């Protein structure tokens, strides 16, 4: 809030008014414009995490493709399969690489599923989730603008109070990474 007051007071000076004449430029109404770190920061983190996820998946898919290529390349090389650290039955080295590719592909699906929660945001919830200091259409306008800017299917959380204190999407994604 202090930054908003500094900005408002400087604006007042530039407009020829005295500092503190907030009827002309209010720290809340004109500078802050319904923004809150309790909704803006988490929303930015969600969007940033989703973009990071997309980059990560791109690289995982490159590794999957490399495993598949090695699977084809070594399809004829026989080796001993292992079971509980002991030799088991014959298999090809190509099958081993294809197995690695399948495992990684399944993990990418898990990450994709977890990353969907990043698209649910609390923008417009303001300080505690009630949206009390924002205009009634503020949240829907923010979501529309974010969709337009990002091209992502961003959606507003059903319960803004809960979403304001909820970090489960970060915990869920971290869990999927393990």
For each predicted feature, which ranges?
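Conserved, well-structured ligand/cofactor-binding cores
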Residues: 1-178
């Amino acid at each position: 809030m202090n930054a908003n007051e500094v900005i408002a007071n400087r604006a007042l000076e530039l407009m020829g008014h005295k500092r503190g004449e907030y009827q002309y430029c209010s720290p809340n109404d004109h500078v802050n414009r319904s923004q809150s770190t309790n909704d803006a920061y988490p929303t930015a983190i969600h969007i940033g995490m989703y973009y990071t996820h997309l980059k990560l998946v791109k690289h995982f898919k490159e590794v999957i493709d490399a495993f598949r290529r090695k699977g084809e390349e070594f399809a004829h090389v026989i080796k001993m399969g292992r079971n509980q650290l002991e030799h088991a039955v014959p298999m090809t080295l190509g099958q081993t690489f294809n197995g690695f590719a399948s495992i990684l592909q399944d993990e990418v699906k898990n990450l994709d599923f977890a990353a969907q929660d990043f698209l649910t945001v609390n923008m417009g919830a303001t300080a505690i989730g009630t949206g009390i200091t924002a205009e009634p259409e503020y949240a829907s306008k923010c979501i529309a603008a974010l969709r337009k800017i990002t091209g992502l299917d961003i959606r507003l959380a059903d319960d803004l109070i809960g979403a304001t204190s909820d970090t489960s999407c970060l915990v869920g994604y971290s869990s999927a990474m393990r």
